Amino acid sequence: MIHLNILYWPPAGGFGLNTNILEINIINLAVVLGVLIYLGKGVCAGCILNDLLENRKQTILSTIHDAEERYEEATEKLNQARTRLQQAKVKADEIRVNGLTQMEREKQDLINAADEDSRRLEDSKNSTIRFEEQRAIEQVRQQVSRLALERALESLNTRLNNELHSRMIDYHIGLLRAMESTTDQFL
């Protein structure tokens, strides 16, 4: 018959803990455990424990070694990333400077083109003004000549009578004969 009176049922029907050391056989359990440890120490328990500790040690060392390798790889990748970042910053600065230079050059080209267009427009305007002035002057001359001719004809018509008309014709005929004789001498 096995006596396990570690837990007992009190008469009231509740749950409780037996604190009587003699009734729970704690001394017997301690003696059995002590003998097992003493006998197992030299045989297999020590080997198993040593093997377990050695395996655990190797696992920990392997984990540490793997962690160190990953740390070295991560450090190398970080350094490479920093190098690429620095190169990217340098390239970005070059692009920014080139962009600003290009923008200034294009701005200056636009200013120069606008100045050239302005100069050409000014020249064209001045040329058009001179042309229009010449045309206006020519129109005024033609009008003045026409008016002068009309007045002269009007004056001649009012003053010219038959006798004056005959004298004018004779005078011009004489001029033409004189011119004809002069040209015959040169030939």
From Swiss-Prot:
Record keywords: ATP synthesis, CF(0), Chloroplast, Hydrogen ion transport, Ion transport, Membrane, Plastid, Thylakoid, Transmembrane, Transmembrane helix, Transport
Transmembrane parts of this sequence: 29-49
Domain of life: Eukaryota
Keyword Chloroplast set for record: yes
CDD domains: ATP-synt_Fo_b (cd06503)
Subcellular location per the Swiss-Prot or TrEMBL entry: Plastid, Chloroplast thylakoid membrane
Keyword Lyase found: no
Membrane topology value: Single-pass membrane protein
Family the UniProt entry places it in: Belongs to the ATPase B chain family.
Assembly information from the UniProt record: F-type ATPases have 2 components, F(1) - the catalytic core - and F(0) - the membrane proton channel. F(1) has five subunits: alpha(3), beta(3), gamma(1), delta(1), epsilon(1). F(0) has four main subunits: a(1), b(1), b'(1) and c(10-14). The alpha and beta chains form an alternating ring which encloses part of the gamma chain. F(1) is attached to F(0) by a central stalk formed by the gamma and epsilon chains, while a peripheral stalk is formed by the delta, b and b' chains.
Name this protein carries in UniProt: ATP synthase subunit b, chloroplastic
Organism: Angiopteris evecta (Mule's foot fern)
